[in-house]
């Protein structure tokens, strides 16, 4: 229905963003992994590559950072037993390049670790993923990179990203500060956020 939507990122919450385009606000489902990358672009112009899932009572828009990820999602949900929620969960867990590596290595265990994917489904998926995923990698370069503004500090970006996912500011500041202490000075936001979330989860499991 739409190839992409270009507009202002006006709102984010876990699993959802709103893009304003020509006076309309498009509610779009997206992976939390990508939403964390977008935190520094709130109230700025972005491009979202979209896929529409038509249901009996509604049309649901899913958004992706590249055409490659969108085509991967399209391929995933074509498999029996893999719906949009599970397809998005796979892309939330693995970047497209990582998913290609998993397919090449036939790492069924890694794929089966995704919520909603059991061992049998992972084994069935692996055959087609290994064959088809490499064709999508060139499309993965078609992203919204050219619309990114100059970055503020990773600390500020990280706090904004966690706040967008519902963490209180005080908790977000603590999580980012703890993660930064474990990484080199030149660590990127993409490296900091997974460490912050992992350490926070470990702390919750201990309590």
From Swiss-Prot:
GO terms for biological process: DNA recombination; DNA repair. InterPro entries: DNA_helicase_Holl-junc_RuvA_I (IPR013849), Hlx-hairpin-Hlx_DNA-bd_motif (IPR003583), NA-bd_OB-fold (IPR012340), RuvA (IPR000085), RuvA_2-like (IPR010994), RuvA_C (IPR011114), RuvA_C_sf (IPR036267). Residues 1-65 are annotated as: Domain I. The RuvA-RuvB-RuvC complex processes Holliday junction (HJ) DNA during genetic recombination and DNA repair, while the RuvA-RuvB complex plays an important role in the rescue of blocked DNA replication forks via replication fork reversal (RFR). RuvA specifically binds to HJ cruciform DNA, conferring on it an open structure. The RuvB hexamer acts as an ATP-dependent pump, pulling dsDNA into and through the RuvAB complex. HJ branch migration allows RuvC to scan DNA until it finds its consensus sequence, where it cleaves and resolves the cruciform DNA. NCBIfam families: ruvA. Gene3D superfamilies: 5' to 3' exonuclease, C-terminal subdomain, DNA helicase RuvA subunit, C-terminal domain, Nucleic acid-binding proteins. Has three domains with a flexible linker between the domains II and III and assumes an 'L' shape. Domain III is highly mobile and contacts RuvB. Residues 155-207 are annotated as: Domain III. Homotetramer. Forms an RuvA(8)-RuvB(12)-Holliday junction (HJ) complex. HJ DNA is sandwiched between 2 RuvA tetramers; dsDNA enters through RuvA and exits via RuvB. An RuvB hexamer assembles on each DNA strand where it exits the tetramer. Each RuvB hexamer is contacted by two RuvA subunits (via domain III) on 2 adjacent RuvB subunits; this complex drives branch migration. In the full resolvosome a probable DNA-RuvA(4)-RuvB(12)-RuvC(2) complex forms which resolves the HJ. Residues 145-155 are annotated as: Flexible linker. It comes from Chlamydia felis (strain Fe/C-56). Its main location: cytoplasm. Keywords: Cytoplasm, DNA damage, DNA recombination, DNA repair, DNA-binding. Coiled coil: none annotated. It is found in: Cytoplasm. Belongs to the RuvA family. The keyword DNA-binding applies. This is Holliday junction branch migration complex subunit RuvA. SUPFAM superfamilies: DNA helicase RuvA subunit, C-terminal domain, Nucleic acid-binding proteins, RuvA domain 2-like. Residues 66-144 are annotated as: Domain II. The gene is ruvA. One of its GO terms (cellular component) is Holliday junction helicase complex. The keyword Kinase does not apply. Pfam families: HHH_5, RuvA_N. Disulfide bonds: none annotated. One of its GO terms (molecular function) is ATP binding.
């Amino acid at each position: 229905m739409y190839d992409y939507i270009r507009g202002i990122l006006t709102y984010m919450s876990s699993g959802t963003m709103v893009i304003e385009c020509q006076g309309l606000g498009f509610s779009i489902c997206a992976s939390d992994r990508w939403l964390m990358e977008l935190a520094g672009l709130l109230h700025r112009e972005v491009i979202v590559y979209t896929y529409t899932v038509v249901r009996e009572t509604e049309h649901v828009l899913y958004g992706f950072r590249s055409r490659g990820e969108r085509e991967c999602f399209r391929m995933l949900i074509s498999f029996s037993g893999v719906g949009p929620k599970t397809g998005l969960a796979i892309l939330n867990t693995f970047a497209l390049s990582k998913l290609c590596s998993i397919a090449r290595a036939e790492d069924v265990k890694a794929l089966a670790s995704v919520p909603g994917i059991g061992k049998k489904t992972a084994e069935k998926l692996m055959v087609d993923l290994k064959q088809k995923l490499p064709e999508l990698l060139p499309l993965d370069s078609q992203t919204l990179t050219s619309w990114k503004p100059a970055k503020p500090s990773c600390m500020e970006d990280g706090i904004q990203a966690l706040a967008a996912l519902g963490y209180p500011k005080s908790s977000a500041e603590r999580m980012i500060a703890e993660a930064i202490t474990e990484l080199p000075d030149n660590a990127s936001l993409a490296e900091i956020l997974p460490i912050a979330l992992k350490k926070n989860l470990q702390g919750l499991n201990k309590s």
